[in-house]
UniProtKB/Swiss-Prot annotation:
GO terms for molecular function: 3-beta-hydroxy-Delta5-steroid dehydrogenase (NAD+) activity; isomerase activity; oxidoreductase activity, acting on the CH-OH group of donors, NAD or NADP as acceptor; steroid Delta-isomerase activity; testosterone dehydrogenase [NAD(P)+] activity. It comes from Rattus norvegicus. NAD(+) binds at K159. Its EC number is 1.1.1.145, 5.3.3.1. The active site is at Y155. The chain crosses the membrane at residues 288-308. Keywords: Acetylation, Endoplasmic reticulum, Isomerase, Membrane, Mitochondrion, Multifunctional enzyme, NAD, Oxidoreductase, Steroidogenesis, Transmembrane, Transmembrane helix. The keyword Lyase does not apply. 3-beta-HSD is a bifunctional enzyme, that catalyzes the oxidative conversion of Delta(5)-ene-3-beta-hydroxy steroid, and the oxidative conversion of ketosteroids. The 3-beta-HSD enzymatic system plays a crucial role in the biosynthesis of all classes of hormonal steroids. PANTHER family: BIFUNCTIONAL POLYMYXIN RESISTANCE PROTEIN ARNA, SHORT CHAIN DEHYDROGENASE_REDUCTASE FAMILY 42E, MEMBER 2. This is 3 beta-hydroxysteroid dehydrogenase/Delta 5-->4-isomerase type 4. It comes from the Eukaryota.
Length: 373
């Protein structure tokens, strides 16, 4: 079906931008609509300088604004929904996270039905599967195994419920009598250039004499490069649009990983930044069980102080578990159904990310030098 169009929500974000960069290379695509609450001026400029004949329409609007979503969805063939509030420490109020991640997704699904959009791809997260306990080991898990987060924390809960809504919407009747087909992708922890998590970590290290904070040394994870996650979304869009593949993709979820070596989060951070003189904190750290119970104690303190003071602990049991579990998943189902193979190798991903970290270090070299004196 030539002349198709795609709406990408959260398009100003870390992953959304990469999806757009790959989308404009797609065959027969006539328009990409990019939606976010606010676009930075440099992001707008990048979209307009993509060097493509494909129309790129920039829309600013709120995922909770139903009228905005209906306008954004008019005439669209595929929606790729990446907009989300990622918050594992409770910076934002619980209701705000639920509104954006769950209600926003429900609003967008309804807008698709009203505008007769036939394909919907949801960017979920591995967090919807757990880990529920740092004591339970899951290595090379897959979709045929039942893994579901039992946390009530707003981020994993909202993403889990939103994914359920997306998959339940598969087969919905559209306003024009057509059928809505949906699928969900569950990426592992995403790293790469412009990662907001890596940015925060590097800047914190530069203010601490180049010492990287140790937060996940007990973990075994399989992080995934942002370019490969973006590629998986492109393949999912192709899959839902291809009559031969669509039957196998509809209503399915897929773990998205790549060939990045399985390692701890701390080892990944060190590998990506060691070239620039950063190193892991070698001082003594609390044993994991003690750290977990300390997090529980801080949560109790926060609960009792809440009526009079908004105390937010820097870590909680969910974050301790997330950062210190042995929890990895295979991408074989995505390979089988979507034809997914990592577009970027580990060596290339490592080099690109490390070079970007180098630019961050260079920008803040004065801070590092001052701290080192």
């Amino acid at each position: 079906m030539p002349g198709w169009s795609c709406l990408v929500t959260g398009a100003g974000g870390f992953l959304g931008q990469r999806i757009v960069q790959l989308l404009v290379q797609e065959k027969d695509l006539k328009e990409v609509r990019v939606l976010d609450k606010v676009f930075r001026p440099e992001t707008r400029e990048e979209f307009f300088n993509l060097g493509t004949s494909i129309k790129v329409t920039v829309l600013e609007g709120d995922i909770l604004d139903t009228q905005c979503l209906r306008r954004a969805c008019q005439g669209i063939s595929v929606v790729i929904h990446t907009a989300a509030l990622i918050d594992v420490t409770g910076v934002n109020p619980r209701q705000t996270i639920l509104d954006v991640n769950l209600k926003g997704t429900q609003n967008l699904l309804e807008a698709c039905v009203q505008a007769s959009v036939p394909a919907f791809i949801y960017c979920s997260t591995v967090d919807v599967a757990g880990p529920n306990s740092y004591k339970k080991i899951i290595l090379n898990g897959h979709e045929e195994e039942h893994h579901e987060s039992t946390w009530s924390n707003p981020y994993p809960y909202s993403k889990k419920m939103a994914e359920k809504a997306v998959l339940a919407a598969n087969g919905s009747i559209l306003k024009n009598g057509g059928t809505l087909h949906t699928c969900a992708l569950r990426p592992m922890y995403i790293y790469g250039e412009r990662s907001p998590f890596l940015s925060v970590m590097i800047l914190a290290a530069l203010k601490s004499k180049g010492i990287l904070n140790v937060t996940g040394k007990f973990s075994i994870a399989n992080p995934v490069y942002v370019g490969n996650v973006a590629w998986a979304h492109i393949l999912a869009a192709r899959g839902l649009r291809d009559p031969k593949k669509s039957q196998n993709v509809q209503g399915q979820f897929y773990y998205i990983s790549d060939d990045t070596p399985h390692q701890s989060y701390d080892d990944l951070n060190y590998t990506l930044s060691k070239e620039w003189g950063l190193h892991l904190d070698s001082s003594w750290s609390l044993p994991l069980p003690l750290l977990y119970w300390l997090a529980f104690l801080l949560e109790i303190v926060s609960f009792f102080l809440h009526p009079v003071y908004n105390y937010r602990p820097s870590f909680n049991r969910h974050l301790v578990t997330l950062s210190n579990s042995k929890f990895t998943f295979s991408y074989k189902k995505a390979q089988r159904d979507l034809g997914y193979k990592p577009l970027v190798s580990w060596e290339e991903a490592k080099q690109k990310t490390s070079e970007w970290i180098g630019t961050l270090v260079e920008q803040h070299r004065e801070t590092l030098d001052t701290k080192s004196q």
